[in-house]
């Protein structure tokens, strides 16, 4: 990893055919429920030698069971991490669980869910960054 690469990546996940909007304005975003940190967007740290896009897709698959298409990166919101807008097929709509001890549930939210380790403002600002 070079100094220009992130330490972690996060995925702002929306559904195919659904506009990416501000929270509460029509679109929905995928969140995972961590046992200690509560609701958050999927993501994690890069493994040794891993490219940020590889880490993004690996974390998305591990934490949600989904694969998606990378639309764009925001490389400036967090000083040590990148946030990607990822689109997944529209058929995924109901809450579900995955075989990951760090994820209790996976769910679409059209408002910022109850958060513990994050702030409502973070998710509202990210929604503005990625909105159409």
Question: Where are the regions a protein language model picked out?
Answer:
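A short gly/proline-enriched turn/hairpin at secondary-structure junctions
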Residues: 40-44
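Unchanged
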Residues: 46-131
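Short, acidic/hydrophobic/Gly-rich beta-strand patch recurrent on exposed beta strands
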Residues: 31-33
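Conserved N-terminal beta-strand and adjoining loop/helix that marks the start
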Residues: 1-29, 78
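Residue-level signal for short, function-critical loop segments
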Residues: 35, 45
């Amino acid at each position: 990893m070079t100094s220009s690469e992130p330490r972690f990546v996060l995925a702002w996940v929306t559904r195919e055919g659904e506009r990416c909007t501000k929270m509460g304005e029509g679109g929905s975003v995928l969140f995972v429920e961590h046992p200690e940190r509560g609701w958050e967007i999927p993501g994690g740290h890069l493994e040794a030698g891993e490219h940020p896009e590889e880490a993004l897709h690996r974390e998305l698959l591990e934490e949600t069971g989904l694969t998606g298409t990378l639309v764009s990166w925001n490389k400036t919101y967090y000083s040590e991490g990148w946030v990607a807008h990822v689109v997944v097929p529209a058929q995924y709509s109901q809450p579900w669980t995955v075989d990951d001890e760090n994820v209790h549930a996976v769910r679409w939210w059209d408002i910022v869910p109850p958060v513990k380790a994050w702030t409502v403002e973070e998710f509202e600002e990210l929604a503005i960054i990625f909105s159409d």
